[in-house]
């Protein structure tokens, strides 16, 4: 069964919901998600220490910055809904699974702490369904295609990006059902249906990014030949910053999860953040204006890029010292 939203079925909210907010999941499910996420992150840190070259640190920062900027732009999907880039497949393919997961985690944590996008209690769940699950799905398919022709690899990466969104949506539906928030029989087809469309956008963006890298800086796709120099770092950050200029044009329609919550009647269970710093990607003293959104995006891009690169360098230095 496919649930297709119709215009006017659900009002656009003042606070667009891009990630799972507090209140959607039970405490028990949230704790389980935290335990799983922390266990996987512990493995990721250990493996990242063993495997990645320090020259990958700035690449991780640039990738995190681009994904953050990309996630700010919701694109319209079907009458009255929107979607946005997750970016996990892109991060895992370019950085490898371990450093890729750390980059995705940095993005998701910063979004929750600074921009109040995603709950604090359910942060572990957001890392699980936006970082771990989609990244492993997309990267798993990519591993199968390694060594094959460029065309096959590109097609498989696109398919993996699409599938990663659908699987992440299904896992989210399971978490909602097990939390008692809504019925599994309703949540699964509703989440899967709309995210099959959102996944097309994910696939197109991921393939475009990979193709651009392959044409302009192919060494980035070969982690054993990590590129050096500062020109590509400046260029990568410039692209991320340019993307933020388009953030005011993002679709105001609710994203897939928010639409499902409205249709299924549990949208009101979402809890507001206990504090606000740059809520909903705006600077409070500038209000909900285009300039406010752009400046908030610039702050986020620079912070997440710098933090991710710093974490990567710190991991490598600890390895060298041990």
Give the residues covered by each predicted segment.
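Glycine-rich ThDP/TPP pyrophosphate-binding loop and its adjacent helix/strand module
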Residues: 156, 174-231
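Juxtamembrane non-transmembrane "cap" segments at the membrane-aqueous interface
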Residues: 251-279
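Hydrophobic transmembrane alpha-helices
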Residues: 19-23, 31-90
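Individual transmembrane alpha-helix segments
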Residues: 17, 278-309
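Short, strongly hydrophobic alpha-helical membrane anchors
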Residues: 1-24
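Alpha-helical membrane segments and adjacent membrane-interface helices in multi-pass membrane proteins
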Residues: 74-135
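Short, charged juxtamembrane terminal tails flanking transmembrane helices
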Residues: 317-322
């Amino acid at each position: 069964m496919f649930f297709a939203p119709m215009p006017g079925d659900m009002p656009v909210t003042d606070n667009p919901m891009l990630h799972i907010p507090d209140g959607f999941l039970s405490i028990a499910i949230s704790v389980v998600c935290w335990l799983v996420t922390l266990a996987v992150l512990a493995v990721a840190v250990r493996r990242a220490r063993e495997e990645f070259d320090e020259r990958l640190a700035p690449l991780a920062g640039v990738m995190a910055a681009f994904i953050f900027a990309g996630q700010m732009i919701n694109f319209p999907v079907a009458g009255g809904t929107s979607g946005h880039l997750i970016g996990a497949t892109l991060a895992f393919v370019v950085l490898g699974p371990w450093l890729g997961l750390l980059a995705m985690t940095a993005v998701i944590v910063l979004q929750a702490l600074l921009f109040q996008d995603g709950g604090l209690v359910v942060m572990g769940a957001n890392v699980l369904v936006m970082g771990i699950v989609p990244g492993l799905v997309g990267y798993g398919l990519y591993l199968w295609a390694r060594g094959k022709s460029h065309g096959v690899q590109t097609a498989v990466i696109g398919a993996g990006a699409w599938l990663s969104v659908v699987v992440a949506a299904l896992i989210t539906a399971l978490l909602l059902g097990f939390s008692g928030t809504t019925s599994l029989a309703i949540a699964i087809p509703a989440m899967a249906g709309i995210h099959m469309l959102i996944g097309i956008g994910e696939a197109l963006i991921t393939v475009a990014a990979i193709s651009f890298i392959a044409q302009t800086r192919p060494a980035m796709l070969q982690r054993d030949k990590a590129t050096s120099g500062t020109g590509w770092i400046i260029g990568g950050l410039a692209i991320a910053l340019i993307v933020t200029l388009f953030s005011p044009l993002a679709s105001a329609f609710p994203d897939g999860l928010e639409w499902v919550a409205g249709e299924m009647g549990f949208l009101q269970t979402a809890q507001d953040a206990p504090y606000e710093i740059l809520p909903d990607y705006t600077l409070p003293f500038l209000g909900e204006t285009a300039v406010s959104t752009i400046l908030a995006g610039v702050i986020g891009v620079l912070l997440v890029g710098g933090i991710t690169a710093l974490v990567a360098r710190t991991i490598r230095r600890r390895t060298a010292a041990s």
